[in-house]
Design a protein with these regions (language model features):
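Sequence/structural signature of beta-propeller domains
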Residues: 1-313
Length: 313
């Protein structure tokens, strides 16, 4: 059993024109790079970021800064917002290129509903600050996946060599299994960049089974790639039978997969926090313990999301 440490709540800046929502309540993705934390929330139209020093993780409480990604305003009403939200669930760092020497961030919607089939690329400045963003329509890509995965729900992803790896999150419904999906990374990025001649095709689909708690399967909500090519997955057991309806979080855990996708370690998290994002706290890994950062989604707009820290053996 692992015991996460609370580092901070994810408050937004307060201004004279502040909206009623003063915090993130549905954090869904996390990247740590360029001395910053970058976050997305599944019911927001913005990227959020804040300076972060892994040497003093518990001493930082500056408000999050926002960078708009999608146009328009989402409804304040909880039910209407859930129907309209873009459901941005995957946040990953793309490698540097001559056109983007600091790399780019890529956000992906979960893909189930039409409103959730968009991606946003964000350029990063020399200091890591978010710059211009480009919105991509992923309808064709997700239509192809939906043909073979009925309850499509992409929750995380990463680049591993020449592969793009995406995580399909399962649920309690019969046949709704979690899976690791792989694609040709170069082809996907070319397609994303405008070469729409040929859709990226699914190369492999590996079923993921992490057991269950009280009859509820542990399913992946995010992933962080490690320097050795293995990855850490955040897992929750949410008592629901579809990808849209929320349910009670029965348990939470972290799992480590080797580069071949085989399970190496699985540890439950005390308190069953509904973790939706995971990232390495530092790239300078010493020994066998991984310092990880986690963000939570309480499925309640009145409850702020939190940033947690845990040592993963």
């Amino acid at each position: 059993m692992l015991y996460p440490e609370l580092l901070r709540t994810l408050y937004l800046p307060t201004t004279p024109k502040s909206a009623p929502r003063r915090w993130l309540s549905a954090a869904s993705g996390l990247v740590h790079s360029h001395g910053r934390l970058y976050l997305i929330a599944d019911d927001e139209h913005s990227l959020y970021h804040v300076a972060f020093d892994p040497a003093q993780p518990a001493l930082q409480d500056a408000p999050l800064l926002s960078c708009p990604l999608l146009p328009g305003e989402l409804p304040a009403d909880r039910r209407a917002r859930k129907q309209a939200k873009p459901d941005l669930e995957t946040l990953m760092l793309l490698p540097a290129t001559p056109a983007a020497p600091q790399g780019r961030l890529l956000c992906l919607g979960s893909g189930g509903r039409l409103a959730r089939r968009r991606a946003v690329e964000i350029a990063l400045g020399t200091d890591g600050s978010p710059g211009e963003s480009v919105i991509h329509d992923l309808s064709g890509f997700f239509d192809t996946l939906h043909a073979s995965i009925s309850d499509l729900n992409i929750e995380g992803g990463f680049l591993l060599g020449d592969r793009l790896c995406l995580l399909q999150r399962g649920n309690k419904a019969p046949g709704a299994h979690s899976a690791l999906l792989t694609f040709d990374a170069k082809r996907f990025l070319r397609w994303l960049g405008g070469d729409r001649c040929e859709l990226p095709q699914l190369q492999s689909r590996q079923s993921l089974d992490f057991g269950n708690v009280e009859g509820v399967p542990l399913c992946p909500t995010d992933a962080a790639l490690l320097p050795d090519g293995s990855c850490v997955l955040s897992l929750v057991a949410e008592d629901t039978s579809d990808s849209v309806a929320d349910g009670r979080c029965v348990a939470a855990a972290l799992a480590r997969l080797n580069p071949q996708g085989e399970l190496v370690t699985l540890e439950r998290l005390h308190g069953a926090p509904k973790i939706e994002g995971v990232a390495l706290a530092t790239t300078a890994i010493a020994g066998t313990v991984l310092p990880l950062l986690l963000v939570t989604d309480a499925d309640d707009p009145d409850q702020p999301s939190t940033l947690l820290h845990v040592e993963f053996p």
